[in-house]
Amino acid sequence: MFNSFGNIFRLTSFGESHGKGIGGVIDGFPAGIVIDEEFVQQELNRRRPGQSVITTSRKEADKVEFLSGIFEGKSTGCPIGFIVWNENQHSNDYNNLEKVYRPSHADYTYTVKYGIRDHRGGGRSSARETISRVVGGALAKLALRQLGIHITAYTSQVGPIKLEGNYTDYDLDLIETNPVRCPDPEKAKEMQDLIYKIKGEGDTIGGVLTCVIKGCPIGLGQPVYGKLHAALGNAMLSINAAKAFEYGDGFKGLKQKGSEQNDVFYNNNGRIETRTNHSGGIQGGISNGQDIFFRVAFKPVATVLMEQETVNIDGIDTTLKARGRHDPCVLPRAVPIVEAMAAMTILDYYLLDRMTQL
């Protein structure tokens, strides 16, 4: 049951990093939506490994194959099944991990919980599982387009290098013009240089992604335990390496007084809006029609190419030096994953909202 995400729109994923493939089944997708398979593939390409010198060198085509739920280019309302075959596994790179635990990975917790683990690339705990999320998110984006809802994420911080402005201060069309996926070209160059330097040291680094949802209607969210920001937080923190989530002004708002933090209402030609958006587009757990924006912090990748202390499966102290192909920073490839999780959450809550009133 915990391999599924969503309520009405529901993604169930399967597969491991070094297994035969990664796939999923989507239930609750509305019928009659035009399925642009080229767009879905483009989204996968944004997540795909081997994009640049600051990502893992693993080469995978990551071509999605739809198995059901689509007829003559449109969704039928039936379950949509899909799979992406793994083609470039180097499982021998992980032979030295069979009997030792990698620091800050899921190796130890998986072993204790299940009594068995797939040591090849982390198995089910690998970020390769997010392929299914990106496919599900791409389909959700296609449905949300028809509702005028658009979702954009970008890198806003790598280590100590960060954007000081809000998302409104940047041209978001510049995000895809650099490998870091940052809308500020100068900061993007600094971030890229830092990641490349860290990679050369055999180390890794983390940072922050910012996500903006535009066009979200008023009323999405289910009080008390189904608040929209709680659902978005759950979605984001389910992503590998995600460590923190804040929406609106978040922790920065703690420096303000209530009179400064409040978003006052006004009548904008018959439409009630707020003069500011400290709330991040959500009040009382329900969308208020303003832009929804939030940030997700990602830790440095746990696999570093230097010797570390650890223990083996018998609890004996030893050392470990990782091998294989790994990202020095997850942020560039996490951008489409954050967008995907946001898209699936918003579509799910949109469908839930249709049940509120007859």
Swiss-Prot record:
One of its GO terms (biological process) is aromatic amino acid family biosynthetic process. Its EC number is 4.2.3.5. Belongs to the chorismate synthase family. It comes from Bacteroides fragilis (strain YCH46). The keyword RNA-binding does not apply. NADP(+) binds at residue 47. PROSITE patterns: CHORISMATE_SYNTHASE_1, CHORISMATE_SYNTHASE_2, CHORISMATE_SYNTHASE_3. Pathway: Metabolic intermediate biosynthesis; chorismate biosynthesis; chorismate from D-erythrose 4-phosphate and phosphoenolpyruvate: step 7/7. Keywords: Amino-acid biosynthesis, Aromatic amino acid biosynthesis, FAD, Flavoprotein, FMN, Lyase, NADP. NCBIfam families: aroC (TIGR00033), PRK05382.1 (NF003793). The lineage of its organism: Bacteria, Pseudomonadati, Bacteroidota, Bacteroidia, Bacteroidales. This is Chorismate synthase. Its cofactor is FMNH2. Homotetramer. GO terms for molecular function: chorismate synthase activity; FMN binding.
